[in-house]
Amino acid sequence: MIDQEQVHKVANLARLELTPEEEEQFTTQLGSILDYIQQLDELDVSNVPPTTRAIDVSNITREDELQPYANRESILNSAPEQEGEFFKVPKILNSNE
């Protein structure tokens, strides 16, 4: 169980200024949270496989397919620089890297 002195110490470490009423309130709330965690700790999970998610997640991305765009020239013409059918952008990496 957590007491008001521990709440006061943690508040000081976190640079929080709590009133005595807030310290009492947080002591009660944190005590309830810790009691609940203790109940969870008592559960038998020996037959439960470790997981990072409660439900399975599958990859829902679509295939990367080429989709022609009718106004390609207008997009290329709006670029500051182009080289053939491509945008020309400034080099950002050194050749040493």
Curated annotation (Swiss-Prot):
Name the GO terms of the biological process aspect: glutaminyl-tRNAGln biosynthesis via transamidation; regulation of translational fidelity; translation
Q: What class of enzyme is it?
A: ligase
GO molecular function terms attached to this record? asparaginyl-tRNA synthase (glutamine-hydrolyzing) activity; ATP binding; glutaminyl-tRNA synthase (glutamine-hydrolyzing) activity
From the UniProt record, list the reaction(s) this protein catalyses: L-glutamyl-tRNA(Gln) + L-glutamine + ATP + H2O = L-glutaminyl-tRNA(Gln) + L-glutamate + ADP + phosphate + H(+); L-aspartyl-tRNA(Asn) + L-glutamine + ATP + H2O = L-asparaginyl-tRNA(Asn) + L-glutamate + ADP + phosphate + 2 H(+)
Q: Which Gene3D superfamilies match?
A: Glu-tRNAGln amidotransferase C subunit, N-terminal domain
Q: Outline what the protein does.
A: Allows the formation of correctly charged Asn-tRNA(Asn) or Gln-tRNA(Gln) through the transamidation of misacylated Asp-tRNA(Asn) or Glu-tRNA(Gln) in organisms which lack either or both of asparaginyl-tRNA or glutaminyl-tRNA synthetases. The reaction takes place in the presence of glutamine and ATP through an activated phospho-Asp-tRNA(Asn) or phospho-Glu-tRNA(Gln).
**Subunit structure of this chain's protein:** Heterotrimer of A, B and C subunits.
Protein name as catalogued: Aspartyl/glutamyl-tRNA(Asn/Gln) amidotransferase subunit C
Organism source for this protein? Nostoc punctiforme (strain ATCC 29133 / PCC 73102)
Tell me what gene encodes this. gatC
